[in-house]
């Protein structure tokens, strides 16, 4: 979980051709499977894909990550200072774990399949991971799936071929 205080701002909104001001607000954010699922249902594409996302898509993901408060003026996300956006994305990209998996398979190729929230839910089911883990930082959840896959018994269907 990440808590960020967004300072009050005043500026020109080019969309509405008006001066706007936003109050200082403290956001509680979580990069989780729930936030990825919300974002994918709006944008209809995999969040974890390696493609470049627009500024609008990236800032919208921050709104999907917001746990509290609710009913936030969308202008807060549009006027959020770049340094705070960068801090949020450092948090998103943090592994949140000390666990490392060393593959002993030579020449192992990664699956070309792009993970979506539905696919990650499937992996959770296959691995027997409880749904309450959907609230975890996404990197931790993906690492747990990778650990389950690495520890799975020989002959058992793999929870996930690629993390």
Annotate each predicted stretch with a short phrase.
Residues 1-43, 70-156:
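An amphipathic, hydrophobic-aromatic interaction surface with interspersed Lys/Arg
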Residues 55-64:
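A short, structured beta-strand/loop element
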Residues 157-163:
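Conserved small/polar residues in nucleotide/adenosyl-binding loops
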